[in-house]
Design a protein with these regions (language model features):
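Short, amphipathic C-terminal "tail helix"
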Residues: 227-248
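Interhelical loop and adjacent transmembrane-helix boundary motif
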Residues: 218-221
Length: 248
C-alpha cells in the first residue's frame, strides 16, 4: 500500500501490521500503531501519534451509501477533499480503537493538538477544532461541530448536527441533543448548562476581573466585553458569537 510523505520531513514510523490504502497523504514524524487501518482520501499532518486498532477514513454510516473495499482499491472520492474525505492536522494523539469516518458532503476534520481517548468516535462530516479532548467512548454523530478547547467527558454522546461551543466542558455520560454554549459546564441527559467553566477560562490566561466581565456573555445575559481578552481567545469567541443564526 502506498502513502505520500512530505519532502524533507521527519520519517514516519508505521507498524508493519498497519494498513494504509491508496489516497492517504502523510506529513512527517507520525507514529501509526499495530493493526490500524487508514483509507483514503485522507490527509494527515505532522507529529501525530495514532495508536493500535485505530480506523480512519472508513465510509460514513449511511445505510444507502457506498462501502468500497478501500484498503485494496483507489478511493472513489475527491482526492482534493473538496466535499468528502478526512483531514487531520498535527500533533494529535489518537488512542486505541478510536475512529474517524469519511465525510459525505464535506471533509470530516480534526484540527491540531487534540487528544482522542480510547474508543472515541468522530462521525461523518463532523468538524473538530484545535486542542479538543474527547474522553473514552465519546461519540460524535454526523455533521457535529466541536469548537476549539472543548472537553467532552467519558461516554458523552452528541446527537448529529449538534454544536459544542469553544471551551465548553461536558460532563461524563451526558447526552447532548442541541447546542452547548461557549465556556459552559454542561451535564446530564438531556445535557443542560450548570455553570461557567472557570477553570477553562483561567487556563486561557484570564484573570478574575476579566472572567467576571465575560461571565454574563457566557450565561447568555450580556454582550462580549470590548477588550481584556487575549487575541487568540477574542478571535475564537467572536467567531462563535457571529455564527449563523441556524446554529443558535
Amino acid at each position: 500500500m502506498s502513502h505520500a510523505q512530505a519532502d524533507g520531513s521527519a520519517p514516519n514510523r508505521i507498524h508493519p501490521t498497519a494498513v494504509l490504502g491508496e489516497g492517504v497523504e502523510l506529513g512527517g514524524g507520525n507514529v501509526i500503531g499495530p493493526y490500524t487501518v487508514i483509507v483514503g482520501p485522507v490527509r494527515i499532518g505532522d507529529g501525530n501519534w495514532i495508536g493500535p486498532h485505530v480506523t480512519i477514513g472508513t465510509p460514513g454510516e449511511d445505510r444507502g451509501g457506498p462501502h468500497p473495499v478501500a484498503w485494496e482499491d483507489a478511493p472513489t472520492g475527491d482526492p482534493a477533499l473538496d466535499g468528502h474525505g478526512v483531514v487531520i492536522g498535527s500533533r494529535n494523539r489518537i488512542r486505541e480503537y478510536a475512529g474517524v469516518h469519511q465525510g459525505t458532503w464535506r471533509a470530516s476534520t480534526l484540527g491540531d493538538d487534540c487528544y482522542l481517548l480510547r474508543g472515541s468516535h468522530i462521525g461523518h462530516d463532523a468538524v473538530v477544532g484545535d486542542h479538543v479532548t474527547l474522553a473514552c467512548n465519546v461519540l460524535l454523530g454526523g455533521h457535529t461541530h466541536v469548537w476549539s478547547h472543548a472537553n467532552l467527558g467519558m461516554g458523552t454522546v452528541v446527537h448529529q448536527g449538534a454544536r459544542i461551543g469553544p471551551g465548553a466542558m461536558v460532563g461524563m455520560g451526558s447526552a447532548v441533543r442541541r447546542e452547548v454554549g461557549a465556556f459552559t459546564i454542561t451535564v446530564g441527559n438531556p445535557a443542560r448548562a450548570s455553570g461557567v467553566n472557570l477553570v477553562g477560562l483561567s487556563r486561557r490566561g484570564l484573570d478574575e476581573a476579566t472572567v467576571e466581565a465575560l461571565t454574563p456573555w457566557v450565561k447568555g445575559k450580556g454582550d462580549l466585553p470590548d477588550d481584556g481578552l487575549p487575541d487568540d481567545l477574542s478571535t475564537l469567541v467572536k467567531a462563535w458569537d457571529a455564527r449563523p443564526r441556524e446554529e443558535h
